[in-house]
Amino acid sequence: MHKLILFSLLFSFLGSPLIAQEAVLTPEFHKSKREALRAEMPANSVAVLFSNPVRNRANDVDYVYHPDPNFYYLTGFKEPQSVLVVYKNPQQDDLGQYVDQLFVQERDPAKEQWNGYRLGVEGAEALGVDRVLLRSEFIKSQTNFTSFEEVLIFEFKNDVRDDKNDPNDLYDLQRTFKENINYPQDFNRLRHRLLKSIRTVGKEDVETLKNEINWYAGRNESIAEDPAIKNFLESSTLEVPEDLKMQVAFLLKDQYFDVELLGQLLGDQREVKTVEEIALLKKAIGISVVGQREVMKAMRPDMSEREIQGIHEFVFKKYGAAYEGYPSIVGAGSNACVLHYIENDDVGMDSDLMLMDLGAEYEGYTADITRTIPKDGTFSEEQKLIYQIVYDAQEAGIEAAVVGSTSGQITRITQEVVAKGLVRLGIIAKEDEFRTYYPHGAAHHIGLDVHDLSNYGPFKANAIITVEPGIYIPKNSPCDPKWWGIGIRIEDDVLITEKGPINISANAPRTWEAIEELMKESSPLDQFLLPELGN
C-alpha cells in the first residue's frame, strides 16, 4: 500500500497548471508552409529536400530516428528514406497539375513487424501533398533538374550509409540526384559561396569582399590555399580581372544548384511562429518549468548530476514529451564552467552550485531553460554576488527583446552589465576582459531546433528566443580563488510581441531569494527510496 501511495504521489504532483493546452499541427499547416515557400522561390525553380539519415549507435543498434526539422515543417512526415520536391510552377502528369511530390518508403510487413509501421503511399496521401509516390520512382523518373533555372537544396550530410541490400535507400536517392545536378564529390559550401560572390561582385564591393575572404582564409586552410581565391586576393585592381572571372565561371560550370537560398527562405518562415507553434512551444516550456521547480524541491547535497538529470527527464516523459530537445546539461561546481558539459556523471561538493540546462521536446518543438541552484539549498555570499550580476544582465536582455531588436543587441546589452559587475568585484581589471568569463552570445531562436533556423535579422512579432547570459569562473582562473568553481547561467524563453517581451518560462524561479525559498519545500521524491543493489 505504501508503494501505491508513493507512486500515486509521484504521478499526481505533476498535475500542474503551468502546462499549456494541447495543440496539434494539421496537414493544412504544413501545406501552408509549402505554399509560403513556393511564393518566395525564384521563377522556374525547384526545391528538393531529403529526410534525415538513420544514424548508427553501435553494431546493429541505431539511434532513435529524428526527422529533419525542415522536412517535417513542410510535410508533417516523420519517416526516413524520403524526398520532398516543391516546384515553383505547376507541373503536369496524367492526373493533371501538381506543385509538390513526396517520395516515401514502400510498405513491408516483415520489416514493420520488427521496426514499426510505415505509412506507405496510401497513408502518406493524408498529408495533403499533391503527389505521393514510392521512393523508387524518384530514381526511375530521371527528372531533368538541370532544366530549371535554380535547384534549391541544403548541403548534403556526410553521414549517410549505403545499404547494399536496398537499391532505393537514402544513399541511392541522394547519389542519383547529385549526379543529375552535377554536385561535386568534394563540395565545399563556403568555397562555393565565395566563388559565386567573386563571380558577381561589383567594383564598389571588391574591397569589402576581400576583407571577408581574408577573415575566412585566416581560419580555414582550404580557403586560403584555393587557387582562384588566392588569385582574387592578390589582384591589385578594383575590378575582378577577366581571366579570373573565366576561371571562376569554369569552376562553377554546370553546377545547377543553390545551397544558400532555401535556408534563407525557410529561415524567414520558421523564425516567426504561428498560433499553433506558439502553443506547442508553450507546452514544451511549461513541462520544462515543472522539471526545474520539482528539482529545486527534490535537490539534496548527495545527489549526482545524473540523478538530477533523471528527475527532469522523468517530468518530461510524464507530460508526454518523448525526448529532450538536446543533450541535457547538468553540471556541479567547475563542471558548470564547461558550456556544453554533458557527461553528467559527477556528484560534486555540498557547497557547489548545480547548473541545469535542459529542454523538453514536445511534438518536435523544444524548450531551452537554464537555472543554477545551490546543492545545499543556500547560496554563499560569493555565489550571490555573481548570481546577481547574471540576473541583472538577463533582466536587461529581456527588456531589450522587442520587435526590431536583434540577438546581437541583446548580447551586447548583457555583456555591458556583466563587464561592469566583474570589474566592480575585482575579478577583471578592465571591462573589455569580460569574455574570459562570459564567452558566448545571449540569444537565439527556438522551435523545431533548439538553435532554430533563422536569418538573425531584426526580431519580428511572434518570434520566440532565449535570453541567457552567464558567468563561468573555472579553477585556476586569474582572479581571487574564492570565485573559482562558480558557473552560473540563467536562461529563459521569451515571446516577442508588439506590446513587448513575454517571459514564457518565468514560473521557474529566477532570483536567488525565490530559488532558496522553493528549495525549502518538501518533494514527493523525499520518500522515494530504492533498495540497495545486490551482487
Predicted regions and their residues:
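Bacterial N-terminal signal peptides
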Residues: F7-S16
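Active-site neighborhoods and metal-handling regions in enzymes and metal-associated proteins
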Residues: Q21-N535
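Positively charged n-region of N-terminal signal peptides that target proteins for export
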Residues: M1-L6
